[in-house]
Design a protein with these regions (language model features):
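Post-Walker A helix-loop "phosphate-sensing" segment adjacent to the P-loop in P-loop NTPases
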Residues: 138-148
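Flexible loop/turn segments at secondary-structure boundaries
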Residues: 252, 280-286, 304-307, 368-371
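Short His-Asn-centered micro-motif
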Residues: 122-124, 274-278, 364
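Pre-Walker A adenine-sensing motif
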Residues: 102-112
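PAPS-dependent sulfotransferases, especially Golgi type II membrane carbohydrate sulfotransferases
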Residues: 1-102, 236-254, 261-265, 310-361, ...
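PAPS-dependent sulfation machinery
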Residues: 149-273
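Glycine-rich phosphate-binding P-loop
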Residues: 120-140
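Conserved phosphate-donor/acceptor-positioning beta-strand/loop module used by diverse small-molecule
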Residues: 276, 287-312
Length: 442
């Protein structure tokens, strides 16, 4: 993709010609009775068949999956390609859970070990979270979740005969070929195919948000395995599910996420986890509850810049799954309200827990203009910066420049909303920034 390619928010409804043709052909086939089955029984049956396993775990909950599937079937109005992708994604999530439960059953030592300390990057979408995440990943002692691991956190080949012989000690590189050499891991190949498919279906999406198979990825994808996650509302029109999610205890999702992180660090240890997702803004209390040693990095950017950028990103994501449901104004109003809600939840936790000294605040402009200063401030929490680390961070930044895949231009008027709509939803947050935030590099 050319670096000077311009992707505009007004172009979110555009799709490649072959994508439109495929959908038309598939719709014709659908009239003849060939449609992806999005019923729970069909999805679980397919996952069990693909893995040869049956146990989803004693803590598996039916309600989140039931509510999500109902909302998808009744509200999302998926086009045929979107329905196919969704079915395969659901089967993969269930299969990952089946494999995880088998791993836990055969290897009790996985869950007995403590979770690594964690640095958690949170903040609204488009505030520099991805940049900071990828910079910190350049420190090899940090344990990051790579995209191929996020898609398939559990090894694919877990035949019982192999499980019996795996060593429980992480220091001895306990796994067989699949995780010992990532280049030979089938999960890497699967993630590469997913990356290529996204490039074909949405050629301009990488200019908005690159999704690379071997790059750090958001750990919200681990929460997806519990079907308690905001990923669906970021990619589909599922208002009933989204509303239910806001009133539902997310504790079980974070409890299971900790299990998966322990499984992942058992496969590949590290000094600390570097986790990242805007989703966590709503649930800082749960991270504090389920993580023993955690520090939060809250990224900040002018809300009238970051929120319109994310609205454009969400709209471009939506058309991968649906034609009819890609209403820009509906998407914009949902996410303006939602981001205001996320910020209020995050501020509520901070206000009630000021004594814990858990937060470092990072401004977008400082991160973009002086990343070395920001990183030096971060590493003051861990013994200080070294010249070797600075060189690694500098190299990582050069390899991942802004606008690497093109230029993203966005305007609120493309979605029928006003700047005042954003300002009205973010009053408390903007006052907090004005009165309290100091850039750690100063």
């Amino acid at each position: 993709m050319k670096k000077d390619r311009i992707i505009k928010s007004s172009h979110y409804g555009h799709r490649p010609w072959w994508f439109r043709v495929l959908n038309r052909a598939w719709r014709s086939a659908g009239k003849a009775g060939f449609k992806p089955d999005l019923s729970k029984d069909s999805l679980i049956r397919a996952a069990r068949k693909s893995t040869g396993l049956t146990d989803l775990g004693k803590d598996f909950m039916d309600e989140p999956l039931d509510r999500l599937l109902w909302s998808i079937r009744e509200e999302a109005r998926l086009h045929p390609v979107g329905a196919f992708i969704t079915r395969q994604r659901m089967i993969n999530l269930l299969a990952a859970r089946l494999r995880a439960e088998e791993m836990f059953r055969k290897n009790h030592g996985i869950l007995d070990r403590p979770l690594l300390p964690a640095w958690v990057i949170l903040g609204l979408q488009r505030t520099g979270t991805t940049k900071l995440h990828r910079l910190l990943a350049a420190d090899e002692s940090n344990r990051v979740l790579l995209s191929w691991e996020a898609i398939n956190p559990v090894p694919l080949e877990i035949r019982n005969s192999k499980l019996e012989t795996w060593n429980l000690e992480p220091e001895t590189r306990h796994l067989e070929r699949e995780t010992r050499n990532p280049k030979q891991d089938k999960r890497v190949a699967i993630a590469k195919k997913s990356e290529n498919a996204l490039r074909l279906m949405a050629p301009g999406f990488f200019a908005i948000h690159p999704v690379e198979h071997n790059a750090p990825e958001e750990d919200i994808l681990l929460l997806d395995i519990t079907f308690l996650s905001t990923t669906p509302e970021a990619t589909m029109n599922v208002p009933s599910y989204a509303a239910w999610l806001e009133t539902t205890d997310q504790g079980p999702a974070y409890e299971y996420m900790v299990k998966l992180l322990k499984l992942l660090q058992w496969q590949r240890p590290g000094k600390r986890w570097i986790l990242k997702s805007p989703h966590h803004l709503e649930f800082i209390n749960l991270i504090d509850k389920h993580f023993d040693d955690v520090h939060f990095f809250w990224t900040h950017r002018e809300v009238t810049e970051c929120i319109p950028s994310f609205i454009s990103m969400a709209a471009h994501s939506r058309v991968i799954f649906s034609d009819e449901a890609a209403d820009g104004n509906t998407i914009a109003r949902h996410w303006i309200r939602k981001t205001g809600y996320m910020l209020r939840k995050g501020l509520e936790y901070r206000t009630n827990n000021q004594h814990k000294n858990q937060f470092t605040d990072i401004y977008y402009d400082g991160l973009v203009g002086n990343s070395a200063g920001i990183l030096t401030g971060i590493y003051s929490l861990d013994g200080g910066m070294t010249p070797e680390l600075l060189e690694k961070f500098s190299r990582a930044e050069k390899n991942n420049p802004m606008r690497k895949y093109g230029i993203h231009e966005y305007r609120l008027e493309d979605f029928g909303v006003r700047k005042e709509d954003i300002l009205n939803e973010t009053v408390d947050y903007r006052n907090f920034i004005k009165n309290r935030i100091r850039d750690i590099s100063r």
